Amino acid sequence: STRVRSSAASDVYKRQACAGGALMDLGVYNVSYVVGLFGSPNKVHYAANITRGIDTSGVLTMEYRSFKAVSINAKDSSSPARYIIQGTKGYLLQKSTANFCGGVTFHPYKGKEEHFNLSAGRPRQAAEFHAFARAIESEDMELCSRMLDTSVAVSRVLETARRDAGIRFTTDL
């Protein structure tokens, strides 16, 4: 990506000891997106392009009971961000990164497309910060618990995926 190439510390991601591969650095956003929407997958597979023990890019497949979710993470190339969720009645298209859900368009197989944008004109993380503030103010421990459960689920997917690809960290037992 441009970010990696232009970084003064661009060699850091290439060192295995830094554990800075594409999956753990960039894939966390994609996995959080998918797990946040659909929960934990039943099976995980990561096909990685590995250079010097670090994945510079890869394809992550998360299998659910009735569908599969596929995510591509890359530090060795770049392309426009696209998120597509396909269903039996049409598909949703998001043309922004996973960590910023901007506009989403529903493209039905029959009928007129619909566009949704709940963050139009607001700072990128405004909705997230407002949700955090509401949870803190109302002491919503149930929400906090669900968010922690999601974080643990995301970590498990990432850990399973990297081990599946044979990526080992110096801290692994």
Predicted segments — roles?
Residues 1-13:
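Single conserved hydrophobic/aromatic residue that forms the stacking wall/gate
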Residues 5, 27, 125:
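Short, conserved glycine- and acidic-residue-centered signature motifs
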Residues 11-40:
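Mid-domain beta-loop-alpha active-site segment that forms a flexible
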Residues 17-24, 114-123:
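A short glycine-threonine-serine/GTX helix/turn-capping micro-motif
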Residues 30-103, 119, 130-138, 172:
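Contiguous beta-strand/loop segments that form the cofactor/metal-binding neighborhood of enzyme cores
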Residues 117-130, 146:
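Active-site loop of classical SDR/Rossmann-like NAD(P)-dependent oxidoreductases
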Residues 134-173:
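C-terminal helix-rich "cap/oligomerization" subdomain common to oxidoreductases
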